[in-house]
Swiss-Prot record:
Belongs to the amidase family. GatA subfamily. It comes from Helicobacter pylori (strain G27). This is Glutamyl-tRNA(Gln) amidotransferase subunit A. The active site is at residues 53, 128, 152. Heterotrimer of A, B and C subunits. Allows the formation of correctly charged Gln-tRNA(Gln) through the transamidation of misacylated Glu-tRNA(Gln) in organisms which lack glutaminyl-tRNA synthetase. The reaction takes place in the presence of glutamine and ATP through an activated gamma-phospho-Glu-tRNA(Gln). The gene is gatA. One of its GO terms (cellular component) is glutamyl-tRNA(Gln) amidotransferase complex.
């Protein structure tokens, strides 16, 4: 597939040809990365075609978050990132499959069916932005937008062999993103390479008055300032690597060796055990989800239950029939930790621990420029691999720290396991220092020159 950098130089006629080619490929593909052929969404604005995750509002398109309960909901307005794309010669073209309401790590909970990993169709593409990553890796999209709540851009990027960037919280407007966990959610790019990630990130970044959490900063210019010759002081967290598979640990050590040979300084640091982060993340995210999803009641918009006797039954049946099992599980757990008698024991304590984790990251960043970790404990696994929801939650163990602290992080493919599946590593940077993330990733990408195909 043509890169985003190349596509931006095409004429309008050439772009229309490209869109037709993508549409034909999607119709012929069995990956199920797109919810439907992009031409079926209706008219598309002029510009380079960008695949959009199904929780980002595109005016006039049915946006469902891959959930039955939102079937029939047509977005009445554009998300701010869509307006930004249009101002930068790009446009939405197709909606990607995802875990229902972005709650999952495998893209198996979508009401539209599973998405397959293009590297091995018997394996998951990761989640929740699995459709976006599978499409980019499978040559079905020039680039894509995803959302990252606990690793939902970076983990599928790692599983599929793409570049995935989670910007600093507040760097990219969330206006028009259907919320899962409002204090963690962030929109970001999934692309074929680091240059494309930089271009797409620059296009969607910047202050937005419609988002009260938007940082009052101008759009970034990271692509213009990409510098592969910078040298950085990089922290590693040895205690956190113990949960990774032997293949991931080998890729980690080999990448560290490459970074040292490139002239970067590596230092060891310590912070709170990553298993604490899992507990904190899921308590807070489920609590916020139970609040955010209360609006989907069968009354205001989306799917409504039929043959009901009263308002109470309408509410119960609409939500029971409309939400999938994982979403129901998180709503119930969220309501539990917010309930009288348990709020202080769970939610309040989790918020206090979140501050401690944020302070630990800030303390490390007083001495270093970047932190280097794996993205996931393993490469992409087979479908129906997890024996329990808890096992699935543990797959986020390396990615959630950046969400808890609001820091930017980037996933870069660095190696292949013995089965030929991609393995990604991530860099985490100081708040609003996406430039350093992209600089070191750009240099490492060229140094490794990894060929996945």
């Amino acid at each position: 597939m043509i890169t985003l950098k190349q596509a931006l130089s095409l004429s309008q006629d050439e772009l229309e040809t490209l869109k037709n080619e993508i549409d034909a490929k999607v119709r012929a593909s069995d990956l199920n990365a797109y919810i439907k052929a992009p031409s079926l969404n209706g008219a598309s604005a002029k510009g380079v075609p960008i695949l959009i995750k199904d929780n980002i509002s595109v005016k006039g398109w049915e946006i469902t978050c891959s959930s039955k309960i939102l079937k029939g909901y047509v977005a009445p307005y554009h998300a701010s990132v869509m307006e930004n794309l249009h101002q930068n010669s790009m446009a939405g073209f197709g909606l990607s499959n995802m875990d229902e309401f972005a709650m999952g790590s495998t893209t198996e909970s979508s009401c539209y069916g599973i998405t397959k990993n293009p590297r091995d169709k018997n394996r998951v593409p990761g989640g929740s932005s699995g459709g976006s990553a599978a499409a980019v890796a499978g040559g079905l999209a020039v680039a894509a937008l995803g959302s990252d709540t606990g690793g939902s851009i970076r983990q599928p990027a790692s599983y599929c062999g793409c570049v995935g960037l989670k910007p600093t919280y507040g760097r990219v407007s969330r206006y028009g993103l259907i919320a899962y966990c409002s204090s963690f959610d962030q929109i970001g790019p999934i692309t074929q390479n680091v240059e494309d990630a930089s271009i797409l990130f620059d296009a969607i970044s910047g202050h937005d008055n419609k988002d009260s959490t938007s940082a009052n900063l101008k759009p970034t210019q990271t692509f213009k300032n990409l510098n592969k010759d910078k040298r950085f002081k990089i922290a590693i967290l040895r205690d956190h690597i113990k949960d990774a598979s032997s293949e991931v640990q080998l890729a980690y050590e080999n990448t560290l060796k490459a970074l040292k040979e490139m002239g970067h300084e590596i230092v060891e640091k310590k912070m709170l055990d990553s298993h604490y982060q899992i507990s904190i993340y899921y308590i807070i995210s489920m609590a916020e989800a139970s609040s955010n999803l209360a609006r989907f009641d069968g009354v205001r918009y989306g799917r409504r239950a039929q043959n009901i006797k009263d308002l109470k039954e309408l509410y119960l049946k609409s939500r029971s029939e409309g939400f999938g099992d994982e979403v129901k599980r998180r709503i119930m757990l969220g309501n539990f930790v917010l309930s009288s008698g348990y709020y202080d024991a769970y939610y309040l304590k989790a918020q206090q621990m979140r501050l401690i984790i944020k302070e630990q990251y800030n303390k490390i960043f007083e001495e270093v420029d970047l932190i280097f970790t794996p993205v996931a404990p393993t490469s992409a696994h087979l479908f129906n691999y997890h024996a329990s929801p808890l096992e699935m939650y543990l797959s986020d163990i390396y990615t959630i720290g950046a969400n808890l602290s609001g820091l930017p992080a980037l996933s870069l493919p660095v190696a292949k396991d013995p089965l030929g599946l991609p393995i990604g590593m991530q860099f985490i940077a100081k708040a609003f220092d996406e430039q350093s993330l992209l600089d070191i990733s750009y240099a490492l990408e060229q140094e490794l020159d990894l060929k996945l195909d």
